[in-house]
């Protein structure tokens, strides 16, 4: 319900550039049905992230239904930044069989998109020239699950977030080392906490390409229970 017309236009342009079929399926009827079903149980409680996640799960259910009916494997769109801090809905946008961007941080996704618009790899199956609309790369990222939502409402700016995550994950550094380098202590500590508590989501994420030094899975696995911390 909160998907902007700009995002719909960008999706149409992306499909056109790639030569893909585009179908638009509104989730409003399903959302209204869930609202009615859960209303007696949610009575007296304000709308919050629960309703946001229901939207994502309805999308995941719809996409999986199309995958079942027509056969193609559903790909997830989450990147390493989002999966690191749990900025994804389990059984929602995490639903799928393969995660193409699983080992790419958000800032790297932007750089790869810009590169692909300029280059066509020799073995690529896609078209030459631009394949990603510039506005998709340049506009503020948003899950669009509530009015005027931006990723930075919940997370540090991606350049800062990725710097922290690369140090903690790829380099196996510590929060104390980052703080000693001059980064804001509250921000670093919060990102580290999110990294730990999102472990249960990552365990249920689909497999994907390994590109970096340490991907989530065999390279980096931590206990889920008992509020585990390394220090």
Which role does the model predict for each range below?
Residues 1-231:
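ATP/NTP-dependent adenylation/nucleotidyl-transfer catalytic domains that generate, transfer
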């Amino acid at each position: 319900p909160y998907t902007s017309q700009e995002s719909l236009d960008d999706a149409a342009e992306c499909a056109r550039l790639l030569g893909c079929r585009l179908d638009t399926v509104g989730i409003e009827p399903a959302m209204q049905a869930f609202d009615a079903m859960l209303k007696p149980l949610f009575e007296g409680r304000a709308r919050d992230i629960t309703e946001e996640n229901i939207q994502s799960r309805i999308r995941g259910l719809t996409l999986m239904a199309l995958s079942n009916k027509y056969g193609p494997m559903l790909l997830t769109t989450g990147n390493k930044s989002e999966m690191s801090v749990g900025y994804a809905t389990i059984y929602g946008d995490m639903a799928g069989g393969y995660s193409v961007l699983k080992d790419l941080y958000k800032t790297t996704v932007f750089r790869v998109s810009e590169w692909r618009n300029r280059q066509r790899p020799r073995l690529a199956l896609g078209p030459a020239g631009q394949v990603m609309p510039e506005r998709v790369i340049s506009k503020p990222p948003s899950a669009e699950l509530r009015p005027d939502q931006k990723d930075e409402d919940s997370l540090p700016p991606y350049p800062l977030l990725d710097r922290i995550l690369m140090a903690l994950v790829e380099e196996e550094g510590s929060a104390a080392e980052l703080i000693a380098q001059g980064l804001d202590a509250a921000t670093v500590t919060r990102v580290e906490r999110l990294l730990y508590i999102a472990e249960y989501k990552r365990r249920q994420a689909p497999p994907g390409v390994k590109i970096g030094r340490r991907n989530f899975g065999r390279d980096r696995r931590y206990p889920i229970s008992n509020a585990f911390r390394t220090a």
